[in-house]
Amino acid sequence: MEEKRLSAKKGLPPGTLVYTGKYREDFEIEVMNYSIEEFREFKTTDVESVLPFRDSSTPTWINITGIHRTDVVQRVGEFFGIHPLVLEDILNVHQRPKVEFFENYVFIVLKMFTYDKNLHELESEQVSLILTKNCVLMFQEKIGDVFDPVRERIRYNRGIIRKKRADYLLYSLIDALVDDYFVLLEKIDDEIDVLEEEVLERPEKETVQRTHQLKRNLVELRKTIWPLREVLSSLYRDVPPLIEKETVPYFRDVYDHTIQIADTVETFRDIVSGLLDVYLSSVSNKTNEVMKVLTIIATIFMPLTFIAGIYGMNFEYMPELRWKWGYPVVLAVMGVIAVIMVVYFKKKKWL
């Protein structure tokens, strides 16, 4: 089914839950509850079975995949006391990254990207996070994400994640998402290297199309990174009560990573813009080379055509026409002229 546009919400009152993304069959709820000593994980499609974790005394990660199920989003929102406008933003997948602070929770919108090597396109997916006292709610559009490293650390008690509260889980999820941006930038860097080689050695129409697509990808990435910097800046500067002081340096570290990513994106944009200029210059040079060859050929044939034109005149008294060696002599003269001109052009380095 086609993706709904924002116009689908026209005329509806604020807080009306309308999903604006692509409808998919995927739907599941993943729950990970843990402490230093214990760990519990399960998947379900029954929303009622996960609601009791709201009052858990240990950190819980509830990942809801398939937000086209607006009834599930509404039920979770009602039970956890989430504002209707926040639920509306969760279902409106065209949000820019942002953070909003409420009395009992923190709401964050992020973007997750996947790179299609065949189409050379970025596909974005909105990921919404809600931090409560002991719980992190995550809302995704489809199955498949970049958070498996976090899952592994929780399952096998690696690092300090199971010694920390839910705010550290929130940091870990954001950090995993930002780390994936570095992987994405490596793929884009490889694509730039390939395009540079093609532009310099064998520029084709497909090359410039891929270059334009790469430029669009970088613009899309830039539109995500810049507001993400504001999100992380708010998390470590305007520290909400739900985030402990010990966790603040971790958010500052992720913020530093976003600055590095933003700088890399700007560098890549400059390189790609330069590639387009190089492509146009290469095409222009090839055209000039062709025109030069054609001009030289035309110049060589000008005196030959002149000689042929003289002897093509229909005058009755032209002595050379009746001369036995006239024809081979004229051909020889024309050949000598052509050779002299070719030698002259090579001496001038025009050939």
UniProtKB/Swiss-Prot annotation:
GO cellular component, one term: plasma membrane
A single BP term in Gene Ontology: protein homooligomerization
Transmembrane segments: 293-313, 325-345
GO MF term (any one): magnesium ion transmembrane transporter activity
Effect of residue 294 to A/V: Increases ion transport by suppression of an obstruction in the transmembrane ion permeation pathway
Effect of residue 299 to S: Abolishes Co(2+) uptake
Activity modulation comment: Inhibited by cobalt hexaammine.
Outcome when changing residue 327 to W: Abolishes pentamerization. Mildly decreases ion transport
Documented effect of changing residue 311 to A: Abolishes pentamerization. Abolishes ion transport
Reactions that this protein is recorded to catalyse: Mg(2+)(in) = Mg(2+)(out); Co(2+)(in) = Co(2+)(out)
Topological domain ranges for the Cytoplasmic compartment: 1-292, 346-351
Residues making up the signal peptide according to the UniProt record: none
Sections of the chain in a coiled coil: 178-225
InterPro entries for the chain: CorA_cytoplasmic_dom, CorA_TM1_TM2, Mg/Co-transport_prot_CorA, MgTranspt_CorA/ZnTranspt_ZntB
Site features described as Threonine that confers selectivity for Co(2+) transport, chain residue numbers: 295
Keywords, ordered alphabetically: Cell inner membrane, Cell membrane, Cobalt, Coiled coil, Ion transport, Magnesium, Membrane, Metal-binding, Transmembrane, Transmembrane helix, Transport
Main location: membrane
Membrane topology summary: Multi-pass membrane protein
Residue positions of motif Probable selectivity filter: 312-314
Resulting phenotype, residue 295 to M: Strongly reduces Co(2+) uptake
Effect of residue 288 to L: Abolishes Co(2+) uptake
Stretches in topological domain Extracellular: 314-324
NCBIfam families: corA (TIGR00383)
Subunit structure: Homopentamer. In the absence of Mg(2+), interactions between subunits are weakened, and dimers, trimers and tetramers can be observed in vitro.
Record note on domains: The central ion permeation pathway is formed by the first transmembrane domain from each of the five subunits. Mg(2+) binding strengthens interactions between subunits and leads to the formation of a symmetrical homopentamer surrounding a closed ion permeation pathway. Co(2+) binding also induces a conformation change. Low Mg(2+) concentrations trigger both a conformation change within each subunit and a loosening of the interactions between subunits. This results in an open ion conduction pathway. In addition, this results in a less symmetrical shape of the whole complex.
Name of the protein: Cobalt/magnesium transport protein CorA
Gene name for this UniProt entry: corA
